[in-house]
């Protein structure tokens, strides 16, 4: 049976979940936790490593590590890892590719569908850049959903939310704050009004 993959690449941590039929499971990306740090480290040989290992290596060579690069999404100024310039989109693509590879290896093949969450206040420009990052990661067919919408879907998986019910979502992440009001429609949600967000307000 095929499966779907959802990815939340946050400012500080990245998480993933898989869905098969009516069953949804958190996918353990790290060795000791479900999430991994959204951190990229450039090795001396030019390869990048991601997550917990990158975090440890960055303590030894802090000039070769990138953290919180989601906040730089759409910024034309490159992020320097050592002497190598990287865009935030390229770093995000590296994390997405790692997640996709781990999930595909453990599930015996690639997912049938992929959804990637993004902050509610991202406009068409940043969503297009996210699409480009997904393409670089081999996820060109991914669907993009706002983080409040993804949170509402997760909530509805465990609580009764009837057709037409309205929910308010307040999402305080590591680097961004989003708020949105959504109405249950069929198997999903529609956003009412304009979602609001503060891009540099979070838990870090």
Give the positions of each predicted feature:
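Amphipathic, well-packed alpha-helical segments that form the structural scaffold of globular domains
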Residues: 70, 74, 96-104
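Adenine-nucleotide phosphate-binding core of ATP-dependent small-molecule kinases
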Residues: 80-101
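Oxyanion-binding/catalytic loops of NTP- or PPi-dependent enzymes
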Residues: 1-71, 80-81, 85, 105-204
